[in-house]
Swiss-Prot record:
It comes from Ectatomma tuberculatum (Selva ant). GO terms for molecular function: monoatomic ion channel activity; toxin activity. The keyword Disulfide bond applies. This is U1-ectatotoxin-Et1b subunit B. It is found in: Secreted; Target cell membrane. Keywords: Disulfide bond, Membrane, Secreted, Target cell membrane, Target membrane, Toxin. Belongs to the ectatomin family. Ectatomin-Et subfamily.
């Protein structure tokens, strides 16, 4: 669906932003994204 597509598009950006401030958060986000 559209939501899943949008999430997949946003994931790399979210991971990049999270990496700048919090590495563990980035890892969590990446795991969630990989499971989409």
């Amino acid at each position: 669906g559209l939501k899943e597509w949008a999430m997949k598009k946003m994931c790399p950006i979210a991971v990049r932003l999270a990496k700048k401030c919090d590495g563990t958060l980035a890892t969590k986000i990446k795991e969630i994204c990989d499971n989409l």
